[in-house]
Amino acid sequence: MTEITAKTPWAGHTGDVPLHLDYFDGSMFEALELVAKKYPRNIAFDFMGKPTTYPQMIEEIKKCARSLKTIGVRAGDKVTIAMPNCPQAIYMFYAVNLVGGIANMIHPLSAEKEIEFYLNESESVTAITLDQFYNKFESIRQNTKVVNIIIASVKDELSKPVRAGYMLTEGRKIAKIPKDAPVIRWKEFMNMGKACFWNYSVKRTGDDPAVILYSGGTTGTTKGIVLTNRNFNALGQQIIAANPMFNPGDKMLAAMPLFHGFGLGVCVHTMLSQGGRCILVPRFTAKSYAKLITKYHCNFIAGVPTLYEALLRLPSMEGADLSSLKGVFSGGDSLSIELKKKLDKFLYAHGAPVQVREGYGTTETVTACCLTPPHMFKEGSIGVPFPDTYIKIVEPGTDQEVPYGTEGEILLAGPTVMKEYMKHPDETAQTLRRHADGLTWVYTGDLGTMDSEGFVYFRGRAKRMIVSSGYNVYPGQIENILDANEMVQMSCVIGIPDAYRMQKVKAFVKLAAGIPANDATRQALMSYCSKHIAKYAMPCDIEFRDELPKTLVGKVAYRVLEEEEQAKHAAETPAAPAEEEKK
């Protein structure tokens, strides 16, 4: 075994958190099954007021696995899951793992062309989605190799009183699927397992691929990140070790989506593999989030800065009792020092005995791999690494470490590092590099510093990326879509300041000769974008320019446009009163 010689300046500053752990080497499902046997009376998750125990969950997962086997899903097959946070998504995710398949997790609100790309890139043989998204899947199905589409409905997992209300409101808006549609409905699918009389369980180890999540990687082009059983199981153990105050049965509000590493890895798998209880939130609104925190007396909540900004403004939170909270985590985007101060003050005023703890990570490491320790806060820091995780700061693109306090590229290593980029060996080799210290490092493309006690400070993204409400938006992808339109000669996409989302997407377009720069053209381009771009990545505005600024080598100077927008935003933002400035 190679000796690890990487520096660990954070040793001695992690409090009760150990530096090393012994990791479970089985599958994700096996981790759940062990916990279910250990805590047979514990509730695994709640959905719209309906609780499900660990034994009930395991039984449903096994039924789902038998049904997958019956329709022909085999070891190594990819199954696309395009679902919100709901019970069927949980059952399918772990059932795919149980039969030895790989879960391909995608956003259910993705545009049709994006869905087609995800299905083909992963070579999925089966897909599951909700009834309200049926038309998107059916319209592109013939362009893929998908054999079976399983259609679930939220109403199937609701208690009778809640179901009645749902059918009178949200359920009425969903178009009925034709009876002869070539799909398998969830209830029908789950009954298919009764025909499975052979072994449906496939033995898997920690090193086996288990999940595909999507990210722009180091270049901004969408690619699948292949993650293993060990990646997820290790993350679960690390999260619990980094939070010694956790007890089995503690409740986490699971509002972050399942196609996101944090939602899947922390809010769901960490809790379910460690005996916790997930409060599943199928559709996020700040109002519903706030209501659930107090209704269930949640112990842990996690979100992006946008979410917390919204919570501060909610009238319903004025008298809320937050004394049950043990951990409040922020990630997905940089948390400003001022917002953290406001949040900490808000938590204190509402009886919470904790402060916001900021973390940092990438999809290449599932999600967070460092976190502010519970006993020690440093202003502006994103914390220290999890057990067995290593972080170092180097001259960008090299293996040369920079002195403490000097800005450089953030590199990550540890048990949650991805297996590879699917079908992109060159980018895998560019992102994962073995060093003389015995570790394989992820080159994040992000800039930061580290102090002499091992605390890390995030400084910015070296790669061009917009973070809007915690979602990663890659300008290059949107520019490619715009440039493909015959009305467009050239485009440039940037992120502009937004009080709620932190950043929103704006497109600058140079139109093709003869195309009028008017509202009709703008609306036509917006309509075109809506068919090709997910809602969270849609431009909020398209501004027409006769020419786009260029760099000396002829590239579009996006930084010039960013500076223009920042100056415009600063001019529109009222200055603080003199009295406040003195404070």
Enumerate the language-model features and the residues they cover:
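Conserved AMP-binding A3 loop
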Residues: 53-55, 201, 210-234
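AMP-binding/adenylate-forming catalytic core of the ANL superfamily
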Residues: 110, 127-129, 301, 414, ...
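Conserved AMP-binding/adenylate-forming core of the ANL superfamily
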Residues: 41-86, 90-94, 111-116
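Conserved structural elements of the adenylate-forming
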Residues: 58-63, 191-194, 206, 225-247, ...
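Conserved pre-ATP/AMP-binding loop-to-beta segment of ANL
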Residues: 176-214, 221, 244-251
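Conserved ATP/PPi-binding loop(s) of AMP-dependent carboxylate-activating enzymes
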Residues: 384-388, 400-433, 473
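Conserved AMP-binding/adenylation subdomain of ANL enzymes
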Residues: 233-251, 259-302, 310, 314-315
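Gly/Ser/Thr-rich phosphate-binding loop
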Residues: 298-303, 312-379, 390
